[in-house]
Amino acid sequence: MVFTSPAWCSQLASTIPETKLVGDFVLEGNGTESGDKPLLVCAETGKSYNIGVLENRVDLLARSLMRVFGWSPNEGAPEDKVVGICSFNAMDFVPLSWAIHRVGGICLVLHPTSSAAELQSLMRQASCKALFTCRDLLPTCRAVLEALKLESSRLFLLELPADEQTTQAQPVSVSQLIADGESLPPVDKVALQDGESKHRVAYLCPTSGTSGYQKLAQITHKNITSNILQAVTLDGFATRTAPEVALGILPLSHAYGLVAFSTLLYRRDTVILHARFDMPAALRSIQQYRIQRLYVVPAIVAALVNNPILFKLADLSSVQSLIVGSAPLSKELVGALKRVRPEWDLLAGYGLTEAAVFVSCTSKHSIFPGSVGSLLPHVEARLVGDDGAEIQDYDVAGELFLRSPSIMKGYLVDDATDSGAFDADGWLITGDVASFRKGPDGEEHLFIVDRKKDIMKVKGIQVAPAEIETRLLSHPAVDEAAVFGINDAEAGERPFAFVVRSKMVNVDLDEKALRQSIHSHIQETLSEPFWLRDNIKFVESIPKGHSGKALKFKLKELI
């Protein structure tokens, strides 16, 4: 059975371009006139860019990159023009990536929390020729370039607010490149043949690496332009007249943040950009800029629910909707937030780097708590059971297979390894277990169960760690949680949880009492195979990949 998007959003708002770079597509926009209105605002300094400034900075950066690297937009293979960006969120992060595209190159996005070994490995995989980074990461990145035998002149500074105030000697900065571009000739337009945007890679994006190995997903220009159009169509904003103000806290070094940012600019929304996530600073931004839309992850929602004092730090009355991605948003968490903020629309979604990035999202047209919404237009989905047979019914879980114009070109690896990402008919094998259910209004909704490799069998019963994690996060004394299966002589497997205690709730409880409280909390709603008993370990932090997902293979080493 092939599942598709609802009938009311089956057609895209406009045709997917076949010969356009993603940056040019976003800068042209959806037809909404923005004039001098700020589209990008630095939360720390108030510095802003309107559409004209953005276009000018991309143009001048491209001129300088062409001179510095000696590249011509229409000569040489894009694979030989890979430039990396390893930085926290900077005003020029995305404009820089678009300038790289304009000289015929590919942008490798690298997370700023990556180790030197990780950076070295990914840059070597990509044959990266140069790297832009922020001041805090200069020592690490200098060592990486030296290990890769790249000249120090191939390291550049992408300024953050603090960087712009320093007088210390630094590598050539983006600001200097833009200034130099004023006196340089224009860059020829990249000449894409009809249909070439489907194959030309725009970004190399590391996957989440929750199993310990990061692959580089090849995301093409058409992948992203498709996903932008898919998102605005389902979201119902394709024909709206009033742009919104959005909170920009997602890391631009991750596909979720990168595509969400591009979508907002395409719609001519204003993005209030934070270099790093800081809850009090984010809340102050909401009050100062009257922010209406928040792009967040479930951990942020859980923090708000479990720490009501946060609602008193700022006036949040402007907020209208939360787009929640990266992990499923449980029905319990939705209910808890609705009790304190009933006027907020919680729009849960599902995506993955390999789909660049959104696959489904909840629309205001059809809300089904606990689901990750409806499939985006032009997305097709199948569910395959453990026996390899295709599932034909609702409410039956199976591995999720996808087809969409936003699906990546493939991994940057040998064909033999890459072939495991797709089946014989070209469907992406996600590795996620999911089901479809019909909501009260009769619309199909997608539910994510867990990663296939993470599901354990307790006394022959399938137990999804995500279900236990969801319940744990609803305990007021739990800030973070990660669950996986361990061997058990009697049951085959049993769940084991790593828990980060709240620093604000039940701080006086000793570990034994808190462990019992958590166990009772689990017992209230989950059956015996899901119980943790004494399988709880308290830790200061949970190691995470660059997508924010727990690195469970590292936790298993701590038992």
Curated annotation (Swiss-Prot):
EC numbers: 6.2.1.-
Cysteine pairs bridged by disulfides in the record: none
UniProt keyword annotations, A-Z: ATP-binding, Glycoprotein, Ligase, Nucleotide-binding
GO molecular function, one term: CoA-ligase activity
Glycan attachment residues as annotated in the record: N30, N223
Its job: Fatty-acyl-AMP ligase; part of the gene cluster that mediates the biosynthesis of echinocandin B, a fungal lipidated cyclic hexapeptide that acts as an antifungal agent. Linoleoyl-AMP, produced by the fatty-acyl-AMP ligase ecdI, is transferred to the initiation carrier domain (T0) of ecdA. The linoleoyl-S-phosphopantetheinyl-T0 is sequentially extended with L-ornithine, L-threonine, L-proline, L-homotyrosine, L-threonine, and 4R-methyl-L-proline to form the linear hexapeptide.
Record remark: domains: Both substrate-binding domains (SBD1 and SBD2) are involved in the substrate recognition, and are sufficient to confer the substrate specificity.
Name of the protein in its database record: Fatty-acyl-AMP ligase ecdI
Recorded name of the encoding gene: ecdI
